[in-house]
Amino acid sequence: VDEGRLGKIYHYRANFLQDWTINTDLPQGGEGLWRLDAKVAGSGVTGDLLAHCIDTAIWLNGPIVEVSAMTETFVKERVHTKTGKKQKVTIDDACAFLAKFANGSLAIFESTRYARGHKALYTLEINGADGSLAWDLHDLHRLEYYDYDKEDPKTRGWRSIHVSDN
């Protein structure tokens, strides 16, 4: 991105999906479930998961200047582990938002703990005039890079790049 290989950036997409709170019988509160308590966690998926997507996006693509978001709490009440009584859930279970970066590119961000089958799916993709870049947490050391080679159309295409500390 810093080298300009993607050209002018048009789109940024990121998601962070999990399924560990989809069970409606899952209680809230206590040491193991502090993320479900707004008094302790501060927020739900927006602060816990989506914050990583936002931080990475700003690092790669610059500041965000506009946002329009929606959140949802799918299970409105859960039994508290300490009291055994039902209490209102005060965190967000899912968040989706559109954003605009200072460079003019548009973004879509999504995070949820209600994506059955996903334990920690975190992906991002950046699309530019000259190429695209995709990354998946499940394959941490690999970038997928599409090079739109203007000089030689025969070399256009996706490439898998192994990345490491070196």
Residue ranges and their predicted role:
Residues A51, E110-K119:
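Glycine-rich phosphate/pyrophosphate-binding beta-alpha loops
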